[in-house]
């Protein structure tokens, strides 16, 4: 990992805090999730949800979306200035599912945003608690990462669909702050930058005019976030070039796409956090658990332990497989959409299959779907072991590049090799090494060529028994070295549409 001395830990970003010691961090993260739990309980009371209905993940998602919408100042302002038919800018709502006479019913509810904000603040000691809101955004983003593919978005920006493993956090809203930036993949940042540059190419006044400074600052900030994700000097130097460009255009887009491709082997550092649905925190608070006193961490044993003792339900469509639905939500809870399936399977204790083999669609139910045939089942979110979440890309030998896998961005700090098809990746780098970044490009290609697929990442790191909360006895799994495990092979997922 690049020297983290100057960076705040991602729990600090998550809670908006300055430097704190471990105990203070655990307490402030605990306060954050405890606030989410209290809010959820209060909403269940307001909506008169039964215990079973309150544990339904679809109801949890509706309630989460309502509070996110209530605090979305930019959109609220926009809605007030551009009134659209049938949308009350002061109200928010969504589908709530209730059990009536042995059947599931959908009820559309509407609430004043002001009222939702009041309930949220009340649950969070009168504060806005933006950290808690960001936490919910990251949970939704992790769910999207596991559920949808972004091939169309990749192709639209001129990137290759095989770079899907770099797209973590691609559906996070812009307002998700430092905690959101930490979990965004290299591809996501590249895509945001390319969109911005394309706007500048098409709109002459984008870099000029009254917003000139704000636009420029936003551009440089995004460049710096992306630069911070790269772990080799040459990649960072190329980012400096992109950032300092007077008038960003096609040359910068080329450089960014080159960098994104290089990240398939010279992986960036991307944070992973286990963000759980609000109902899980609600259940714990309701059972008397004091998160702030006990402390909580998003990257250790705590989320695993919470999921061991939580019963969450989901609506199931007629031809869906409940075990597959559980896998989808398990991956989302641990931010493991881009993890090697060999590692995920070992930790979960049951085989985790690629998305192309899942008989399940997304968790959310569209408003035109027939409720008559809906069933519900328990989500199996427990695990056999737990492991520490990582924020490094798993490159071996300090700052040197290691074998990447076209399709993996490690989530868990667990020893494994990262098999990859060098030929497939290198084929993308033929030709263009001229221009002002030529020496950096040459250096990056040289590092990639010297990467070996048999190198071991996270040397000596293992998983832990759920009884081993202090992480004293690592169990280092041995994996079949040849068999790479990408979730995205044979992909048949739907596209993500806003």
Swiss-Prot record:
Keywords: Capsid protein, Helical capsid protein, Host nucleus, Host-virus interaction, Ribonucleoprotein, RNA-binding, Viral nucleoprotein, Viral penetration into host nucleus, Virion, Virus entry into host cell
Keyword Oxidoreductase in annotation: no
Domain of life: Viruses
BP term (GO), one: symbiont entry into host cell
PTM info: Late in virus-infected cells, may be cleaved from a 56-kDa protein to a 53-kDa protein by a cellular caspase. This cleavage might be a marker for the onset of apoptosis in infected cells or have a specific function in virus host interaction.
Locations listed in the record: Virion; Host nucleus
Coiled coil: none
Location of the motif Unconventional nuclear localization signal: 1-18
InterPro entries recorded: Flu_NP
One GO CC term on file: helical viral capsid
Function: Encapsidates the negative strand viral RNA, protecting it from nucleases. The encapsidated genomic RNA is termed the ribonucleoprotein (RNP) and serves as template for transcription and replication. The RNP needs to be localized in the host nucleus to start an infectious cycle, but is too large to diffuse through the nuclear pore complex. NP comprises at least 2 nuclear localization signals that are responsible for the active RNP import into the nucleus through cellular importin alpha/beta pathway.
Subunit and partners: Homomultimerizes to form the nucleocapsid. May bind host exportin-1/XPO1. Binds to viral genomic RNA. Protein-RNA contacts are mediated by a combination of electrostatic interactions between positively charged residues and the phosphate backbone and planar interactions between aromatic side chains and bases.
Family that this chain belongs to: Belongs to the influenza viruses nucleoprotein family.
UniProt-recorded name of the protein: Nucleoprotein
Lineage of origin: Viruses, Riboviria, Orthornavirae, Negarnaviricota, Polyploviricotina
């Amino acid at each position: 990992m690049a020297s983290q001395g100057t960076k705040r830990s991602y729990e600090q970003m998550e809670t908006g805090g300055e430097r704190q010691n471990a105990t203070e961090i655990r307490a402030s993260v605990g306060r954050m999730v405890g606030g989410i739990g209290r809010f959820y309980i209060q909403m269940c009371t307001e909506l008169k949800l039964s215990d079973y209905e309150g544990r339904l993940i679809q109801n949890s998602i509706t309630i989460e979306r309502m509070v996110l919408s209530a605090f979305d100042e930019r959109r609220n302002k926009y809605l007030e200035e551009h009134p659209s038919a049938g949308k009350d800018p002061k109200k928010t709502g969504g589908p709530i599912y209730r059990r009536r006479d042995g059947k599931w019913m959908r009820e559309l509810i509407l609430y004043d945003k002001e009222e939702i904000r009041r309930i949220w603040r009340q649950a969070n000691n009168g504060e806005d608690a933006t950290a808690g809101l960001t936490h919910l955004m990251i949970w939704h983003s992790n769910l999207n990462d596991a559920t949808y593919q972004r091939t169309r978005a990749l192709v639209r920006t001129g990137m290759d669909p095989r770079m899907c493993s770099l797209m973590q956090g691609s559906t996070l809203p812009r307002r998700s702050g430092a905690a959101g930036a930490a979990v965004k993949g290299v591809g996501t940042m590249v895509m945001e930058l390319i969109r911005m540059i394309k706007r500048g190419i098409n709109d002459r006044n984008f870099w000029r005019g009254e917003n000139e400074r704000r636009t420029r600052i936003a551009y440089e900030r995004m460049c710096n976030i992306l630069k911070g994700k790269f772990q080799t000097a040459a990649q960072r130097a190329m980012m400096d070039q992109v950032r300092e460009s007077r008038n960003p255009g096609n040359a910068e887009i080329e450089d960014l796409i080159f960098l994104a491709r290089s990240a398939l082997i010279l992986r960036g550092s991307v944070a992973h956090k286990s963000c759980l649905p609000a109902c899980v925190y609600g259940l714990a608070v309701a059972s008397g658990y004091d998160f702030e006193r006990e402390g909580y961490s998003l990257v250790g044993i705590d989320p695993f332990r919470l999921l061991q003792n939580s019963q969450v339900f989901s609506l199931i469509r007629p031809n869906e497989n409940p075990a597959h639905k559980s896998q989808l939500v398990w991956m989302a809870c641990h931010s493991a959409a881009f993890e090697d399936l060999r590692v995920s399977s070992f930790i979960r204790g049951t085989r985790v299959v690629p998305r192309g083999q899942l008989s399940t669609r997304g968790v959310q139910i569209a408003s035109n779907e027939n409720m008559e045939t809906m069933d519900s089942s328990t989500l199996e979110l427990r695990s056999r072991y737990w492991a520490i979440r990582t924020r490094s890309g798993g490159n071996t030998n300090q700052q040197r590049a290691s074998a990447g896998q076209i399709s993996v961005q490690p989530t868990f700090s667990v020893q494994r090799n990262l098999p990859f098809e060098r030929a497939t990746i290198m084929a993308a780098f033929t030709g263009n090494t001229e221009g002002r970044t030529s020496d950096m490009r040459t250096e990056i290609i040289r590092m990639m060529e010297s990467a070996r697929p048999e190198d071991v990442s996270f040397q000596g790191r293992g998983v832990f028994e759920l009884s081993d909360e202090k992480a004293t006895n690592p169990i280092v799994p041995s994996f079949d070295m040849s068999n790479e495990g990408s979730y995205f092979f044979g992909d048949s997922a739907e596209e993500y549409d806003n």
